[in-house]
Amino acid sequence: MAETTASGYIQHHLQNLTFGQLPNGGWGFAHTAAEAKEMGFWAFHVDTLGWSVALGLIFVLLFRMAAKKATSGQPGALQNFVEVLVEFVDGSVKDSFHGRSPVIAPLALTIFVWVFLMNAVDLVPVDWVPQLAILISGDHHIPFRAVSTTDPNATLGMAFSVFALIIFYSIKVKGLGGFIGELTLHPFGSKNIFVQALLIPVNFLLEFVTLIAKPISLALRLFGNMYAGELVFILIAVMFGSGLLWLSGLGVVLQWAWAVFHILIITLQAFIFMMLTIVYLSMAHEENH
């Protein structure tokens, strides 16, 4: 495979199916990264939205099916799996969340399963989903990205949703005055009112950076790990297309080895996203941090 062809292959697999306003004023899909960039802020990543919604529906339907078939007698395989998963998440919440809220455990379960399913799509061979999109659309230049968590828009969207909950519960539990005081009166304090007033800008700067770093680090950690994993799969696929027998053979070994290792990564990243969400919301429920 020539270098330019390999470069084009990689760029094509890392480009989202973007829908937005074209330079001619009409609306349609971008075929190149340059066209997608020209669409601006109001462009939609159709593949990211489609996969995330579809996998969310699969999660809801599977758990609804398990709930409807739940029995106190001999449970089926699906019921056993769901019960183990629910107990695992519930135990994680009890260990890490020190407030009282009926929302946190269901939220943690939703985050873990949903993020895991989106990550797990990365185990599908990199060419299958894009080729299926080409067959359906009939357009050989159309890009299609299957792993939603390799799109920073998806991870940032989830992270800032968690951030909104952090702000909501901080104000609900501590009151607006308590929340503002948390941002302005900590970590430095003084009994002297004048000195305390001088420390308010310093405290606010430190606390604001700490606060805004939570969703950004939450999003970029998931995105970075999944993007790197997807890129490795794509580079291995380039080996298969090299035309060299020894590279193709090496690609088979690497594909299998990386897929096995990647199972740990996709599970761990879903777990970390869930646990950090629980910890951040626990901090929001504390009177003093």
Swiss-Prot record:
Family matches, as SUPFAM superfamilies: F1F0 ATP synthase subunit A
Kindly give the Pfam families that the UniProt entry links to this protein: ATP-synt_A
Location comes to:
Cell inner membrane
Q: Say if the entry is tagged with keyword Ion transport.
A: yes
GO cellular component terms, semicolon-separated:
plasma membrane; proton-transporting ATP synthase complex
Q: What molecular function does GO assign, one term?
A: proton-transporting ATP synthase activity, rotational mechanism
Q: Name one GO biological process term.
A: proton motive force-driven plasma membrane ATP synthesis
Transport found in the keyword field: yes
Query: Which UniProt keyword terms apply here?
Result: ATP synthesis, Cell inner membrane, Cell membrane, CF(0), Hydrogen ion transport, Ion transport, Membrane, Transmembrane, Transmembrane helix, Transport
Which residues span the membrane? 43-63, 103-123, 160-180, 193-213, 232-252, 259-279
Q: Which InterPro entries match?
A: ATP_syn_F0_a_bact/chloroplast, ATP_synth_F0_asu, ATP_synth_F0_asu_AS, F0_ATP_A_sf
Q: How does it sit in the membrane?
A: Multi-pass membrane protein
Family the UniProt entry places it in: Belongs to the ATPase A chain family.
**Protein purpose:** Key component of the proton channel; it plays a direct role in the translocation of protons across the membrane.
Q: How does it assemble?
A: F-type ATPases have 2 components, CF(1) - the catalytic core - and CF(0) - the membrane proton channel. CF(1) has five subunits: alpha(3), beta(3), gamma(1), delta(1), epsilon(1). CF(0) has three main subunits: a(1), b(2) and c(9-12). The alpha and beta chains form an alternating ring which encloses part of the gamma chain. CF(1) is attached to CF(0) by a central stalk formed by the gamma and epsilon chains, while a peripheral stalk is formed by the delta and b chains.
- State the protein's name: ATP synthase subunit a
